[in-house]
From Swiss-Prot:
It comes from Mus musculus. GO terms for molecular function: cytokine activity; growth factor activity; interleukin-5 receptor binding. The keyword DNA-binding does not apply. InterPro entries: 4_helix_cytokine-like_core, IL-5. Gene3D superfamilies: 1.20.1250.10. This is Interleukin-5. It is found in: Secreted. Disruption phenotype: In IL-5 deletion mice, the intestinal eosinophilia that developed in WT mice during T.spiralis infection was completely abolished, revealing the importance of IL5 for the increased production and recruitment of eosinophils to the gut during infection. Glycans are attached at residues 46, 75, 89. Homodimeric cytokine expressed predominantly by T-lymphocytes and NK cells that plays an important role in the survival, differentiation, and chemotaxis of eosinophils. Also acts on activated and resting B-cells to induce immunoglobulin production, growth, and differentiation. Mechanistically, exerts its biological effects through a receptor composed of IL5RA subunit and the cytokine receptor common subunit beta/CSF2RB. Expressed in lymphoid cells, including spleen, thymus, lymph nodes and peripheral blood mononuclear cells. Homodimer; disulfide-linked. Interacts with IL5RA. Interacts with CSF2RB. It comes from the Eukaryota. Its main location: secreted.
């Protein structure tokens, strides 16, 4: 029990340290991809578990579903060890995305500014989104 508490304390401190040190999110994402590959066998050991998998190919539109599946996976996975750091990193990524979404709040601007934003949005959509049919 002491060992587990010590381990959780270390994980908590590392999470606080990562946030305080403002580790670039790109570094956290790369580390998380590596951890995901390393723990894939453990995470897929429960073949009866069913998780929501978006059919849409534009991942940025399905963030809610992705994190809903992640919560289910987290609750059904044996905790502890290095897999705990994977879930810590995924939690940091979710918090980052939530903070970015807060910037979507509406602000009243002139028509020209709105059209500039719309044009930029459509440009991203035409080059970075997988278009269906």
């Amino acid at each position: 029990m002491r060992r587990m508490l010590l381990h959780l304390s270390v994980l908590t401190l590392s999470c606080v340290w990562a946030t305080a040190m403002e580790i670039p999110m790109s570094t956290v994402v790369k580390e998380t991809l590596t951890q995901l590959s390393a723990h894939r066998a453990l995470l897929t050991s429960n073949e009866t578990m069913r998780l929501p998998v978006p059919t849409h190919k534009n991942h940025q539109l399905c963030i809610g579903e992705i994190f809903q599946g992640l919560d289910i996976l987290k609750n059904q996975t044996v905790r502890g060890g290095t897999v705990e750091m994977l879930f810590q990193n995924l939690s940091l990524i979710k918090k980052y995305i939530d903070r970015q979404k807060e910037k979507c709040g509406e602000e009243r601007r002139r028509t020209r500014q709105f059209l500039d934003y719309l044009q930029e949005f459509l440009g991203v959509m035409s080059t970075e989104w997988a278009m269906e049919g």
